[in-house]
């Protein structure tokens, strides 16, 4: 099989992992705190690791990792229904990996897909167990229908965090600079924390987190990547600052200011890296 075809198959797998991450996080946040929600978040983190491995493999093949999200299964009126959807999503992934293992003849890539498939088979069993557990424990969707200025602010924050997670990961895959790569990955992890904090806060105040992203910068040059990342961090830090000043909820104000301070730090780190890059260039 030629390299371009392998890249296309791996990108299809990335899109499936991307869908699984967002579907599982949506379900976990909607259930609130609890053992099952924590276990589902842990599965989502394993899917993130799969996405990372696949993206790195694509770059090694001189390809570009896809930022598209595959099809999710988001219907269902109960937590047990959600878990059934998660079972089916894992079945979709397992079938895709098995097919690609047969098609791809590169030993290293085949071995990676077999490794990922092993995880998916385990996840499949976990979600089958969660169907029964959700029914037995009467697990509930604790999201509410609140829609006001506060939930709007929080959902805008989620949109930003999701966007920069994708952007920083993409830049980390595409830059040839190891220091920049490491910083991008570190800041992406921090942004993942922010997304979780914001989603949990919305659920706590009877709202509904909306996990969607805006346009992602896909610059090819490291300096351009850093300029785009500095720009978005400065813009969102200012937005969090305005929102914090507007809020009368002490806990929310503290959360927004904490995230603002992180975003300011990210912009400064990227600024240092840009200075180094421009001097070297």
Where are these regions (language model features)?
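Iron-associated oxidoreductase/ferritin-like identity signal
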Residues: 1-281
